[in-house]
Amino acid sequence: MDKSFILNKTSSRSLARRGQLFTAHGKVETPVFCPVGSQATVKTLTPEDLKSVNINMILSNTYHLYLRPGIPIIKEMGGLHKFMNWDGVILTDSGGYQIFSLANLRKLDEGGVSFRSHIDGSTRYITPEDAVSFQQDLGSDIAMVLDECPHSEASENEVLAAMERTHQWAKRCLAAHTLKSQHLFAIVQGGLSPELRRQSAEYLASLDFPGYALGGLSLGEPKDITFETVRHTLRFLPENKPRYLMGVGAPEDLLEGVSCGVDIFDCVLPTRVARNGAFFSRLGRLNIRNAAFATQKGPIDPDCNCYTCRNYSAAYLHHLFRCEEILAYRLATIHNIAFLSNLMQEIRTSIEKDCFEEFKADFLSRYQPTNEAIRIEQKQKWLFGRNGEPPS
C-alpha cells in the first residue's frame, strides 16, 4: 500500500511525533496504544467495549491462533476480522517471541524453528515463509516478520547470531509477502548493544519495509537502559516510516517512548494488572483490594469518565474482587483500557499544540510509578507464562 504513513507534526523540543497510519480497515491516529488480544479476544472485553473507549487497533498473536483453533479454521471463517467480529485494525505478531520463550522446547536452524506445542506436546516446524503465509491467511492489517528474540542473559555472540538470523529471515519474509492490503513490518534486534542495534536498524532500513518494530526490549532490564536503547536505535530508522515499540504499556513508559519518537505500542500490562485488581489513575496504580476502598462511595478514579467509573463505586469493585466475581475483571479492564486510550489522545493533542513536554512533566509530577524492583520481579515471572504456556 502506497503512502501508508503520514507524519503530520514533530515536537520542537523532543522527538515526539504525530502521524496517521492508513490500513485496509481504517486510519489509525498515532502515537497509539494497542490492547493485546492474543487469542482473538482482548480478555473479558467485546469489540463494542473497545470501540466505546475509542480503541480501533488491537494485536493478536499468530503462535496462539496457529495452535488453537488453527489458521485453516480462521481462514475458512472469512479471516480474523470476521472470526472475532472486529472491523477495526488488527496487528498480528509472528509468534517468534512466544516460540523462543519456550527455551528447551524449541530448536532452530537457518531454515526455521521447531518447537513442541505447550498444548498437546506435538512437534511443529515453522519457517519465515510459513509465518508470512499464516498472517496473510489471517488477513491482519499489519503483519510481523519471524525473528529470533535472544534471552535477556544471552552472550554477545548469541545476540549477534540471533540478529544475523533475524536479518536473513526478514529478507525471506519480505520475498514471500504478496498480500498488498497488508503492511509487513521488520523487527530490529541486537540486544542492549548500541553497535548491534545500529547494524540491525541500518540493514533492515535498507530493505525498505513499510514499518519497523523494536524487539527484544522491556524484558526485565532497567527502564533507563530500555529507553537509551530506543533513542539510539531510532536514529537509524527512516523518519517517514512508523516505529513500533513492542511490549510497552505502563503510562510513564508510553510518555517516555513517545518522547523518543515511537508511534505504536502494545502490551498485556493494562489487562493483566486489571485482573489482579490494579486500576490506573493519575496518581499511579490503585489496588482495589486495599481496605480503604471497602466503604468508598465514589468511583475509584474521580477523574475518569469510563463506563466503570460512571456506574460503580469503589466499594462495589472492592467487593467484587474480594469475592472473585468475573465481573470484577471486566470492569477493571474497561477502566484500564479507557485510561490508556484517553492518555494517548491527550498525548496526540499535546503534540499538535507543541506542548507535549509540559504535558509529560505535569503528568509525571503527580504519577507514582510502580517500584522498579517489584516491576522487574513481576516482569520476569510474566515472561515465562503459566503452566508452561508461553506469554501472550
Curated annotation (Swiss-Prot):
Documented EC number(s): 2.4.2.29
Top enzyme class: transferase
Keyword match Transferase: yes
GO biological process, one term: queuosine biosynthetic process
Binding site for substrate: 93-97, 147, 189, 216
UniProt cross-references to Pfam families, sorted A to Z: TGT
Catalyzed chemical reaction(s): 7-aminomethyl-7-carbaguanine + guanosine(34) in tRNA = 7-aminomethyl-7-carbaguanosine(34) in tRNA + guanine
Residues forming the catalytic site: 93, 266
Positions annotated to bind Zn(2+): 304, 306, 309, 335
GO molecular function: metal ion binding; tRNA-guanosine(34) queuine transglycosylase activity
InterPro entries hit by this protein: ArchSynthase1/Queuine_TRR, TGT, TGT-like_sf, tRNA_ribo_trans-like
Segments for region (RNA binding): 247-253, 271-275
CC annotations in GO: cytosol
Names of the cofactor(s): Zn(2+)
UniProt similarity note: Belongs to the queuine tRNA-ribosyltransferase family.
Subunit record text: Homodimer. Within each dimer, one monomer is responsible for RNA recognition and catalysis, while the other monomer binds to the replacement base PreQ1.
Function: Catalyzes the base-exchange of a guanine (G) residue with the queuine precursor 7-aminomethyl-7-deazaguanine (PreQ1) at position 34 (anticodon wobble position) in tRNAs with GU(N) anticodons (tRNA-Asp, -Asn, -His and -Tyr). Catalysis occurs through a double-displacement mechanism. The nucleophile active site attacks the C1' of nucleotide 34 to detach the guanine base from the RNA, forming a covalent enzyme-RNA intermediate. The proton acceptor active site deprotonates the incoming PreQ1, allowing a nucleophilic attack on the C1' of the ribose to form the product.
Stated name of the protein: Queuine tRNA-ribosyltransferase
